[in-house]
Amino acid sequence: MDRESKNELWDQWVSETILTDITSPVTPDPVPMVDESGSQLEMTDEYDSYRLGRGNGDYLYLLYVLDEPVSGSSDIIPVYIGETSQVSSRLLDHFRKLRNSLPTSEWKDDGSWGSYGKYDHIATVFEKANSPLYVWVVDVNEIETGPYGYSTYRQELEAKTVGLVHSHPQFNRVFANRDFVPNRVAHEMGKVGPDWVDLENDSPNEEAVVAADNAGDGVSGTSKADLWHEWVEQTIHKEIHDPEGEDPIPLFETDDDLVVELTEVGSSTVLKRSEAIDTRIRQEGKRCVHRTGVKDGPNGLLYVMYQLESDPPSPEQIIPRYIGKAEAYGKKNELSANFEEIAKDRSGTRSFARWGDGSYWHVGELSDTVFGVDSKKLSWASELFEQGTHQLKEQTYLWIRAWDPEKYTGPYGYPAYLAEVEALLIGLAYQTNPHQLLNHHEVPNGAPANQKQFEFDPSST
């Protein structure tokens, strides 16, 4: 049987979930959101009843419009996808903020980041569509599998469905999500405001063009752990075993006892990154940016902080500690502040593709925690360092690459853009190594990283 494309995965999932509820005589769907009959906009009785009928839980929800008459999944047009544990209050908040964003003729670009926000976007669709705005809610625990055919949880399901919608050729201008969507899109939206939404002349974005009719590479894994190990084997493991490569690259400069060297940045004492990782970050960052902006090609860096159970390791012995990304595009300015030092060949490394030694970046925050200045990276300090010291418990490495969906396949075998693949990998790594992974976002609230009481006695030197 031929493998489905990402477009077909979305269409099939919609057919099995939303469309089934819309066409069922025993569900209230479709549920309209806005009552326009009075002097001011109100919630419909159906919407109010629908949201109040649900207690706390694990919910995914979709705001959508319909291309009627509805005959198939392509007639369901997604406007916004979200997840929450408290759907009643979340839907009330969405209605109020939508109402406050109307009419869009009063929108003005105030020059701030995110000036044309998601509620402005949803309001624009509401005004321009020939359909009411509807809502659909599902308890994720009642869904056996996500659209890729594997078990899932609400934070991961949001990322998966957003990724499929953004990669779909039909929904580029109508879809209002900002998370799990490339920063480039928010940047482009902000330049034109409500004129971004053109329901009659939509055209595919570059991610949809890459994904179009691409069935990707088949995966053999029967579990999410299998998928993680397959992806690691094709990337980190492969590069570690490349005799001409430099991986694994230690994150920090250390002595033989794994005591991390220190450096002074202004008045702050900072953990010193290894020269090899600084070179790698600059090298990969240069593939994404030039002096004044972003190059065609990779839109940023994907990174995995990891440790090894053996040297040389098998894929199963490469233990992920943190997964993240640094997008070259900013949401307001084309060039992200995270890449300015790299783009302009500056010697400073304050931001440094998010691995900088400034107080709001990974190494800076970790240094502040290790030396008792702050506690933002408490979980990292507790798990990576011996108490009261700047000595690593184990050697810690960083794999970082300019992410090119046409070079690297996503973990489910399909092309996956940077803002999408980060969350997909976090979901797989969490399933495989839940007690080692230090990501706090895109994992369940009950994940060890979010429940463990981390402690660290700061180093005095």
Go through the PLM ranges and name each one.
Residues M1-V79, T84-R321, K325-T461:
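Boundary/linker segments flanking structured domains
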